[in-house]
Amino acid sequence: MARNSEKAQSMLFRFREAQAADLGIIDAGRTRRPRAITEQDSIPACEKWRGQVLKDISRKVSRIQESSLSDYQIRDLNDEINKLMREKHMWEVQIRNLGGPNYTRAGGAKVYDEAGKEIGGAGRGYRYFGRAKELPGVKELFEAARAKKGDEKPLEARDDLRKQVDAAYYGYSPDEEDDELLAYEAAKEKEAFENLADNRKGEQLPPGWEPLPGDNGDGKGWELPTVEEVQQELINRRKQRLLNQL
């Protein structure tokens, strides 16, 4: 009886495993990650592999902090982490191409593993994690970059930029005082006004149009009405509106 029970369990286990493979539900802990990432056509499977890569990255980032590691081991671990970061990016691109969530949209934002723990140093390009930043040659690069960043001043504090500008930068260009240029601009302005007037001659004025004083060539300029005149005009219009309603 025990033998038959073991056979049944084994057959059931193989059936469930084949069924999970058909549905794209794979146990990532017992299966080796595929190398041909672009050939994967299941979003759940890609999500599983991406999660496994994140776990590996988090584990190696924690290990690279150990003080017992030699410089060679630290360099090898740092190379492995960078390879895993590139693999993670490839899985994210494949998930996006299949219509899944776009994990690459954040660009150089912070990266977290499945447990919500931030992976320090993650981003684009080759990165140094943990004790790899203290390696000979790498530490000097970080110190030089930090010193260069500290020496840079904001644009508001750079007096040399203000010393290099002249009046032309602020619009007081000597070209604006050129007689030939001013005459050319005046001629072009007159030509534009004449074209506008010619185009308006054939147009019909809208109903209720009242030309301003001085537009008819009578020589009288337009004067701004006073507050009393405006109030009296509004009262007259309201009276006329009431009379029309009666």
Swiss-Prot record:
**Gene Ontology CC terms:** cytoplasm; spliceosomal complex
Keyword list (alphabetical) reads: Cytoplasm, mRNA processing, mRNA splicing, Nucleus, Spliceosome
Stretches the record annotates as Disordered: 196-223
Q: Which GO terms describe its biological process?
A: generation of catalytic spliceosome for second transesterification step
The record's annotation in InterPro entries points to: Helix_hairpin_bin_sf, Isy1, Isy1_sf
Question: Where does the protein principally reside?
Answer: cytoplasm
Q: What does this protein do?
A: Involved in pre-mRNA splicing.
What protein name applies here?
Pre-mRNA-splicing factor ISY1
Q: Which organism is it from?
A: Pyricularia oryzae (strain 70-15 / ATCC MYA-4617 / FGSC 8958)
